[in-house]
């Protein structure tokens, strides 16, 4: 099994194969990807669709001297397998294992780290120009999906690249969402080879030089050329950016891919190759339902993904989806917006029931936020469902287009905190810090499912921009209450009171997901716990009351410490004039790797045991007190 694949330890081994061996290799590689992902979980459909393209790129180009940048990066499992990581695939997305995305520190073949979309063309262009300036002769290749091409950044890069006439740059559009079959067969294959050949490029340049003295004739020639292409391929705007457009070609046909790429390798200037692939290629269940098999957990490939037979706790994403439908049913002004995350954000049912008020704007976070602001000016109630990590991409719009004008937009921020297997690129670590400094913002953090529902309802009633953050995955098991209750603005609640004597009283001010582990720590230490609820405006009165009645104050949040919720509490204490020792707990000042979320939180000291340990070591350890006193005396 995998007889050919076992011989490939790097692309140099691949390039030694005979062309006739490549399709059998592709079959083995596809089977290996399916087997690996079924055991570890991960992205499947997209990787099954890029097998032949990956083989062709490494076969034709001299990687790693030639650079390949994979947009988004979740389709790079075949690339990882062919570049020396075949025997590490069992650790994919596991703690201390290899990443599910390209990572420069992991391999020299991962030339640029990706995970967010639409960055590849900019990076590849920078590499191409950098190589020129350094006097290096190498190709830079960006592989980008049709979804990622909807983002403005991709077109900004195209616009810049088109004027770089000598750059050895290739942009490959991996089009896996075409509604019609790609043109295939001898004629299309011949056209792709012709359009990528040196004769075509040279002839075209020569004709343009000759006809430049007669602009009307040149324009006619251009129109005739475009019309000739249009008879066989889709009309293209890419040549308007200065690219030579080639395709579309079948991205699963190595006999088409390889000669086309070989021709392109001999050209200079920006080239654009349009390949058509199929998500889930070669695995019928994934072909039939690529969304279901986009990012599955472990499963049996022979049986496919089976519905769980054990009752599961409701996820926060489900809580949001149900809330949005309930609010839309009550109020026709409610509008739902998502930047290409319908399933991930829990908006499938909303789209079905309220299609005229559902807007999937594509991978366009900046547009989504400003679009919501425009809706708000017309008296509508826009709700932007967005992952914490992707809201970062629309920071200027959040400030300039929404908060500055104090527009009532609700931000439902999913995947707040650590996200597990996707790792640092997708962690929602920064939203509290980057939103808290924005005037007019109200920010809430949910501690359980029902509180999340009521916070979302509260947010919808506010006359200003309001954010509710909640984590990925299942909640605590708390039932949601159908009736809505508006939470008093800026008010937290005490969930547990200490019975400790003076001198040992600890108050834990917990935010969102950290309420439950803080309560666990408090049981061990006999501490007071407050569910702060609001990060902005923080409950300054509650902060002062607890500081005045306790000896030590601890803040706990699942976000970066610097500038976060704990900082809000410290600022409130300073404003009140109450001086108390404060311990701020949260995510450390580093990018936290992928792994099991519970294990990662434990590693960060943010489970019950870790919180108790930190408090004990800082405030309640007699040995530490004695050492501290001795140090002060000295």
Swiss-Prot record:
Its EC number is 2.2.1.7. One of its GO terms (cellular component) is cytosol. It is an enzyme of class 2 (transferase). Pathway: Metabolic intermediate biosynthesis; 1-deoxy-D-xylulose 5-phosphate biosynthesis; 1-deoxy-D-xylulose 5-phosphate from D-glyceraldehyde 3-phosphate and pyruvate: step 1/1. Its cofactor is Mg(2+); thiamine diphosphate. It catalyses: D-glyceraldehyde 3-phosphate + pyruvate + H(+) = 1-deoxy-D-xylulose 5-phosphate + CO2. Catalyzes the acyloin condensation reaction between C atoms 2 and 3 of pyruvate and glyceraldehyde 3-phosphate to yield 1-deoxy-D-xylulose-5-phosphate (DXP). NCBIfam families: dxs, PRK05444.2-2. Homodimer. Belongs to the transketolase family. DXPS subfamily. This is 1-deoxy-D-xylulose-5-phosphate synthase. It comes from Burkholderia cenocepacia (strain ATCC BAA-245 / DSM 16553 / LMG 16656 / NCTC 13227 / J2315 / CF5610) (Burkholderia cepacia (strain J2315)).
């Amino acid at each position: 099994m995998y007889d050919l694949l076992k011989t490939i330890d790097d692309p140099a081994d691949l390039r030694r194969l005979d062309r006739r061996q490549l399709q059998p290799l592709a079959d083995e590689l596809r089977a290996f990807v399916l087997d690996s992902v079924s055991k570890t979980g991960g992205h499947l459909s997209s990787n099954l669709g890029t097998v032949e393209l990956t083989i062709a790129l490494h076969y034709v180009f001299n990687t790693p001297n030639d650079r390949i940048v994979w947009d988004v990066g979740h389709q790079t499992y075949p690339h990882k397998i062919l570049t020396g990581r075949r025997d590490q695939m069992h650790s994919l997305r596991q703690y201390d294992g290899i990443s599910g995305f390209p990572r420069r520190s992991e391999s020299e073949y991962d030339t640029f780290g990706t995970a967010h979309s639409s960055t590849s063309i900019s990076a590849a262009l920078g590499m191409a120009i950098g190589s020129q300036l350094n006097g290096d002769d190498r190709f830079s290749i960006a592989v980008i999906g049709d979804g990622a091409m909807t983002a403005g950044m991709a077109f900004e890069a195209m616009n810049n690249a088109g004027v770089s006439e000598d750059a050895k740059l290739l942009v490959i559009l991996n089009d896996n969402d075409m509604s019609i079959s790609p043109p295939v067969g001898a004629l299309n294959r011949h056209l792709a080879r012709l359009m990528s050949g040196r004769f075509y490029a040279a002839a075209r340049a020569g004709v343009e030089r000759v006809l430049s003295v007669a602009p009307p004739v040149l324009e006619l020639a251009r129109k005739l050329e475009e019309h000739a292409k249009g008879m066989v391929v889709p009309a293209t705007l890419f040549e308007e950016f200065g690219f030579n457009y080639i395709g579309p070609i079948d991205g699963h046909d190595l006999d088409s891919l390889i000669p086309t790429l070989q021709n392109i390798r001999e050209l200079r200037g920006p080239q654009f190759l349009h390949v058509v692939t199929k998500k889930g290629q070669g695995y019928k269940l994934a072909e039939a339902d690529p969304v279901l098999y986009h990012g599955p957990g472990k499963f049996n490939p022979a049986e496919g993904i089976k519905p769980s037979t054990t009752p599961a706790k409701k996820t926060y994403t489900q809580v949001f989806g149900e809330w949005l439908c309930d609010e839309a049913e009550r109020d026709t002004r409610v509008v739902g917006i998502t930047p290409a995350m319908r399933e991930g954000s829990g908006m499938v049912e909303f789209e079905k029931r309220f299609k005229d008020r559902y807007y999937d704007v594509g991978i366009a976070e900046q547009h989504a936020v400003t679009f919501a602001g425009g809706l708000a000016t017309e008296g509508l109630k826009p709700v932007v469902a967005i992952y914490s990590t992707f809201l970062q991409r629309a920071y200027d719009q959040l400030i300039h287009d929404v908060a500055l004008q104090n527009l009532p937009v609700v931000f439902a921020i999913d995947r707040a905190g650590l996200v597990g297997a996707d790792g640092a690129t997708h962690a929602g670590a920064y939203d509290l810090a980057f939103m808290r400094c924005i005037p007019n913002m109200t920010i809430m953090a949910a501690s359980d499912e029902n509180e999340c529902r009521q916070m979302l309802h509260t947010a919808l009633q506010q006359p200003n921009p309001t954010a509710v953050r909640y984590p990925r995955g299942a909640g605590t098991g708390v039932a949601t209450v159908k009736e809505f209750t508006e939470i008093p603005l800026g008010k937290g609640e005490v969930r547990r009171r200490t019975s400790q004597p003076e001198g040992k009283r600890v108050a834990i001010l917990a935010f969102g997901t950290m309420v439950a582990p803080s309560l666990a720590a408090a049981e061990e230490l006999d501490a007071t716990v407050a569910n702060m609820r609001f990060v902005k405006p923080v409950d300054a009165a509650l902060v002062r009351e607890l500081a005045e009645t306790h000896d030590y104050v601890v803040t706990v949040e699942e976000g970066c410490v610097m500038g976060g919720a704990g900082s809000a509490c410290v600022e409130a204490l300073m404003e009140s004039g109450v001086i108390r020792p404060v311990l701020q707990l949260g995510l450390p000042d580093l990018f936290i790797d992928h792994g099991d979320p519970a294990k990662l939180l434990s590693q960060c000291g943010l489970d019950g045991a870790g919180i108790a340990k930190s408090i004990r070591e800082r405030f309640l350890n007699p040995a530490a007190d004695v050492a501290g006193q001795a140090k002060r005396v000295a």
